[in-house]
UniProtKB/Swiss-Prot annotation:
This is NAD-dependent malic enzyme. GO terms for molecular function: malate dehydrogenase (decarboxylating) (NAD+) activity; metal ion binding; NAD binding; oxaloacetate decarboxylase activity. Homotetramer. GO terms for biological process: malate metabolic process. One of its GO terms (cellular component) is cytosol. The gene is maeA. It comes from Salmonella agona (strain SL483). The record marks D270 as: Important for activity.
Length: 565
């Protein structure tokens, strides 16, 4: 739908002088007009020339290019974000493909590990366990009253890097940057939060620079009571919030999601977002091959909350395509460090127990091993799709990939572990081991592979294709919950934007330069499904689209008018 461009209304603000220059959401730096400089007591506090935001962005781009390491580029961009958010997002949107890996994965992993070392300025909310009884007061200290999206972590499972304590704050900050850059959600509506419940990372506890609570992690009832205090305080302060759980440990991620998804509008991106983008990718890949996902055999390496979340969404999709639940589950094989999940395996977590294979169905397998390894599974299942969410590097060996290719002419291989140092196999190796026949999608960004003089672009199965659009759709529709069907609609919409499906060539996922188009489409699909599911007020399609347009923030300066506090 075409939209008309109209001039943004002036902002009436009470701040002036150095205070205004220190306010990242409002600071324009050298772009304050002559009149604004006079009205807001800025005369003489800025260089003479009044610049446009594009001139500022060009200077920032030149400065950015002067940094040689990715972590230095990350620090530089974070400094701009903490100084002038509008400029930060204009710069990032101008160079999204270059900068997304710098503001988020994989560089954000190093930033989390070095959080206390590279700390410059506070952003977001830090809630430590010793302050648990001051939760309401802490949230009242947040200056932005109209918060609509919170990303919260406890720092225990940061990417594939494990316990980073309050260093995990880098993840909510980076994630919310993508909500804005990709999904058009105003930075004024976003809030990163870290729940500081201690750390079991001895290196951090021994680090004199570590800025978090120096205490072993609280667990069990103490932990869940603390999280519940936080949830109740958030509901009191912002009843209509969208809350995203991020990088919680496996033992807590699924229980927290199960407990709160029907109490507050919430989702877990590691479980549901990863599942949605993976299923969208697989739907597109299957259609490009002239088949359906329900016709594929799928093997997972990694049976944690993320892997099982993906598996359950695949099962739901294949049921939509016509399989019975039992048949759908028989097509999915989960392998963890103890081997294939079977109905005779002890000590399975509840979400794993639904994904076991029955040992009676495996008696004909060609193996003498009691523990069924990934190679055993690949050799006997002859899968079409291999997905890695193990967080361990190098586990997709040459023998395993060649064995898969022996029975599958066009294997789909998805090493999704983050960051790049934890990937199960590199695209270069997978392409070589399959004689150039594999369709590869990764969790972290990789450069195109050149093999035998042919270029193979590598799709990044990035959650940023999904969660910004979900957030925009929830805000625009006023959805009170995020349902499984809303996530399915996001996957289906992503698949519809596949260049490989639509053009018969190219990447299985859209180019990052088109991610705002994809986010808008996902927002509409999610909002429409929310209305159909009864978790949002029904409106016309035109009204929903208008709400999406109205809520889509652009990094442009607005005129300021002076008002009193």
């Amino acid at each position: 739908m075409e939209t008309t461009t109209k001039k943004a209304r002036s902002l009436y603000i009470p701040y002036a002088g150095p205070v205004l220059l220190e306010f990242p959401l409002l600071n324009k730096g050298s772009a304050f007009s002559v009149e604004e400089r006079r009205n807001f007591n800025l005369s003489g506090l800025l260089p003479e020339v009044v610049e446009s935001i594009e001139e500022q962005a060009e200077r920032a781009w030149l400065q950015y290019q002067g940094f040689k390491t990715e972590i230095d580029k990350h620090i530089y961009l974070r400094n701009i974000q903490d100084t002038n958010e509008t400029l930060f997002y204009r710069l990032v949107q101008n160079h999204l493909e270059e900068m997304m890996p710098v503001i988020y994965t994989p560089t954000v992993g190093a930033a989390c590990e070095r959080f206390s070392e590279i700390y410059r300025r506070a952003r977001g909310v830090f809630i430590s366990y010793p302050n648990r009884h001051n939760m309401d007061d802490i949230l009242q200290n947040v200056p932005n009253h109209n918060i609509k999206v919170i990303v919260v972590t406890d720092g225990e499972r940061i990417l594939g890097l494990g316990d980073q304590g309050i260093g995990g704050m880098g993840i909510p900050i980076g994630k919310l940057s993508l909500y804005t850059a990709c999904g058009g959600i105003s930075p004024a509506y976003t809030l990163p939060v870290v729940l500081d419940v201690g750390t079991n990372n001895q290196q951090l506890l021994n680090d004199p620079l570590y800025m978090g609570w120096r205490h072993p992690r609280i667990t069990d009832n103490e932990y869940y009571a603390f999280v519940d205090e936080f949830i109740q305080a958030v509901k009191q302060r912002w009843p209509d919030i969208l809350l995203q759980f991020e990088d919680f440990a496996q033992k807590n991620a699924m229980p927290l999601l199960t407990r709160y998804r029907d109490e507050i509008c919430s989702f877990n991106d590691d479980i549901q977002g990863t599942a949605a983008v993976t299923v969208g990718t697989l739907i597109a890949a299957s259609r490009a091959a002239g088949s359906q996902l329900s016709e594929q055999k799928i093997v997972f390496l990694g049976a944690g909350s993320a892997g099982c979340g993906i598996a359950e969404q695949i099962i739901a999709q294949t049921q939509r395509e016509g399989l019975s639940e039992d048949a759908a589950r028989q097509n999915v094989f989960m392998v963890d460090r103890f081997g294939l999940l079977t109905d005779r395996m002890p000590n399975l977590l509840p979400f794993q127990a639904k994904l076991v294979q029955k040992c009676d169905n495996l008696q004909h397998w060609d193996t003498e091993n009691d523990v069924l390894s990934l190679l055993d599974v690949v050799r006997n299942v002859k899968p079409d799709i291999l997905i890695g969410v193990s967080g361990q590097t190098g586990l997709f060996t040459e023998e395993i990939i060649r064995e898969m290719h022996k029975h599958c002419p066009r294997p789909i291989v998805m090493p999704l572990s983050n960051p790049t140092s934890r990937v199960e196999a590199t695209p270069q190796d997978i392409i070589a081991w399959t004689e150039g026949n594999a369709l590869v999608a990764t969790g972290s960004p990789f450069s195109p592979v050149i093999w035998k003089d042919k270029v193979y672009p590598i799709a990044q199965c990035n959650n940023a294709y999904i969660f910004p659009g979900i957030g925009l759709g929830v805000i625009a529709s006023g959805a009170s919950r995020i349902t499984d069907e809303m996530l399915m609609s996001a996957s289906e919409t992503l698949a519809k934007h596949s260049p490989l499906v639509n053009n018969g060539e190219g990447l299985v996922l859209p180019a990052l330069k088109d991610i705002q188009v994809v986010s808008r489409a996902i927002a509409f699909a999610v909002g429409k499904m929310a209305q159909q599911q009864g978790v949002a007020v029904k409106t016309s399609a035109e009204a929903l689209q208008q709400a999406i347009d109205d809520n889509f923030w652009k990094p442009e300066y607005r005129d300021y008018r002076r008002t009193s506090i």
